[in-house]
A protein has these predicted regions:
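Bulky hydrophobic segments
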Residues: 1-123, 142-156
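Non-cytosolic membrane-interface motifs at loop->transmembrane helix junctions
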Residues: 125-136
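C-terminal or internal capping secondary-structure element at the end of a domain, subdomain, or sheet
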Residues: 134-144
């Protein structure tokens, strides 16, 4: 039974990684706009913490446009929700990642690498707020794992 559980967890993790690579990078291949890299970088990069989050919260508070409100919700919830599995699966697969600081540091490294690829390839946008929201998703996943795990030995 333990072997079946591990195979299932590895399969889920592999599928999750493949889906994330497609969503974050590969679905945008061939869709980058032609133009000067510096100009595109200016519009596709935010290195000011909380700038994007504040703008989405402002849209939710003040906009009467259902489309704009939906876009803000999808972006905020999506950036959090997409990374909940990263707070669940790695701690189940690697005991060393069951401690929150180690998990968050590992997740931050992975997310920063994805953001760097997006920055240099212009496949998507590089946004420090994505890193913050993604880490919030990892934290939420880890908390849910702790909440629903059976026994103290499942997750330290």
């Amino acid at each position: 039974m333990r072997r079946l559980r591990r195979v299932l967890l590895w399969t889920l993790f592999g599928l999750y990684c493949a889906l994330m690579l497609w969503l974050l990078l590969f679905r945008r291949l061939g869709r980058t706009m032609p133009g000067e890299y510096a100009a595109l970088l200016h519009t596709n990069c935010n290195l000011t913490p909380l700038r994007t989050i504040r703008s989405y919260l402002l849209v939710l508070r003040r906009s009467s446009s259902p489309t704009m409100r939906r876009y803000a919700v999808v972006n905020l919830a999506g950036n959090i929700g997409m990374f909940v599995p990263l707070g669940v699966l790695p701690p189940l697969l690697w005991p060393r990642l069951r401690r929150l600081p180690r998990l968050l540091l590992s997740a931050a490294a992975v997310i920063a690498a994805v953001e760097a690829v997006q920055l240099f390839t212009l496949l998507g946008s590089c946004d420090v707020d994505d890193l913050l929201l993604n880490l919030l998703g990892v934290l939420l996943g880890w908390g849910l794992l702790r909440l629903f795990s059976r026994g103290r030995d499942a997750v330290n």
